A protein has these predicted regions:
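N-terminal amphipathic, basic-rich helices that act as targeting or association modules
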Residues: 11-105
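Cofactor-binding active-site loop characterized by glycine-rich and histidine/acidic residues
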Residues: 61, 70-201, 219-226, 230
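Short, ordered loop/turn segments at secondary-structure junctions
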Residues: 105, 210-213
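Active-site flanking residues adjacent to catalytic metal/cofactor-binding acidic residues
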Residues: 182, 209-210
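A glycine-rich helix N-cap at a beta->alpha junction
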Residues: 201-208
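Short beta-alpha connecting loops at secondary-structure transitions
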Residues: 213-219
């Protein structure tokens, strides 16, 4: 397809541009990400999603490069390198009224909800201008105006998202609640309690599992009967 060749040219140009000055400032200078809509087709969706994935990867690589040399970041960081596709897809599907609750690798989900990058970097550097005044850091960052919430680990986002979905249903307001978690979270009892309650009450909730097959060093098939979470 001709548009694939155009996409390749765009990737080469963008990568060359970003390599000239890889820092969090260079990421911000590229401007805010503008999501496409489900009505867009073919080339538009492919280019937009790839742009989102590439920019998120470069964002993370910039943080890796700055993390230890700068020694100014006041928090531990869990990177989402290699897991850019799911946030990119969510950026296409989610609407402003939807809630998004993240696992501990928050940057991609923060990005997917369109929250401001300046406030993300300021938060990581412990600045008062950060999304949470520099008090939350990378893992626990939230941006209430964008309806994005971090601060959950080990299936915690699942229960919180279920509560938000119940609130939406009770108030009869638009939007859905989205819970992001890894396949390791499905080993937790809280996960099964949340999905059981969501099913029983028909809550407006979407469960998004990022399956990288490992919970720290434990292979999934040594912990679970199948690697198909939906089937399980």
């Amino acid at each position: 397809f001709p548009w694939l060749l155009e996409l390749g040219d765009w990737v080469r140009q963008s990568t060359t541009k970003l390599k000239t000055r890889l820092s969090h400032e260079s990421i911000i200078e590229n401007g805010d990400y503008t999501a496409v809509s489900p009505e867009d087709v073919g080339k538009e969706i492919a280019v937009s999603l790839f742009r989102q994935m590439l920019r998120l990867r470069r964002l993370e690589e910039a943080l890796v490069a700055e993390y230890h040399p700068a020694d100014e970041m006041r928090c531990p960081i869990h990177f989402c390198i290699g897991q850019e596709a799911v946030p990119a897809a969510l950026s296409l599907l989610l609407k402003s009224e939807d809630y998004l609750f993240s696992h501990h690798r928050t940057h991609g989900y923060y990005f997917a909800k369109g929250a401001p990058l300046k406030e993300l970097f300021a938060e990581i550097y412990g600045r008062a201008t950060g999304a949470n005044g520099g008090l939350a850091g990378s893992q626990d960052i939230s941006h209430t105006e964008s309806r994005f919430f971090g601060g959950a680990i080990l299936a915690g986002a699942v229960c919180i998202a279920a509560g938000a979905a119940f609130g939406l249903q009770h108030q009869k307001t638009k939007g859905i609640s989205v819970a992001g978690f890894g396949e390791g979270a499905t080993d937790e009892g809280a996960f099964w309690e949340a999905i059981n309650h969501a099913g029983a009450k028909r809550l407006p909730i979407l469960f998004v599992v990022e399956n990288n097959r490992y919970a720290t060093f434990s292979d999934q098939l040594k912990r679970q009967q199948t690697d198909n979470i939906a089937q399980r």
